[in-house]
Design a protein with these regions (language model features):
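Long, well-structured alpha-helical subdomains associated
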Residues: 55-56, 60-62, 71-143
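Catalytic Zn2+-binding segment of zinc metalloproteases
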Residues: 20-37, 68, 75-76, 81
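Active-site scaffold of zinc-dependent metalloenzymes
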Residues: 1-14, 21, 27
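Residue-identity detector for glutamine
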Residues: 8-9, 29, 48, 78, ...
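Post-HEXXH active-site segment of zinc metalloproteases
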Residues: 27-66
Length: 143
């Protein structure tokens, strides 16, 4: 939040809170690290070290959860503060654009890009539902 005027921090803090609540929601729903219905892992990774395979799977699962949570955050802002959407999206795109390792746990660029204008969230009953459709689209593009 360095360099962001205090008057503009409120929407960012709400987005961060919504992001964390999305993690809690997925966990409570019993779908933490689960793909949505109809999705399956395809392909087969190989490595001589089983620990590397486990780390790769963990990063992939984390990236998916982070992508979903970023979308819930953006859906929340679109619903609650549409006038701030472009600014919050730009901030998140910048944060996610600075990943040190592509495809690591916090590389959610594919999902953030899909939500560029906020229109894709539509009129779903909750930010969780609004994020789900965009999340699925990102899953198809991410893997």
């Amino acid at each position: 939040m360095a360099g962001i005027p205090e008057a503009q921090q409120g929407a960012l803090i709400e987005a961060m809170a919504a992001h964390e609540i999305a993690h809690c929601w997925r966990y409570v729903q019993g779908v933490w690290h689960e793909l949505p219905a109809g999705f399956v892992e395809v392909g087969e990774e190989t490595a001589q070290d089983a620990e590397l395979l486990a780390a790769s799977k963990a990063m992939r699962e984390t990236r998916r959860e982070e992508g979903y949570a970023d979308l819930v955050a953006l859906a929340w802002i679109q619903r609650s503060h549409p006038q701030d959407y472009a600014r919050v999206h730009g901030w998140l795109a910048k944060v996610r654009g600075n990943v040190a390792v592509p495809r690591s746990g916090h590389d959610t660029r594919v999902w953030v890009k899909l939500a560029e204008n906020g229109e894709q969230f539509g009129t779903a009953a909750t930010p969780f539902e609004a994020a789900s459709t965009v999340w699925r689209e990102g899953l198809l593009r991410d893997e």
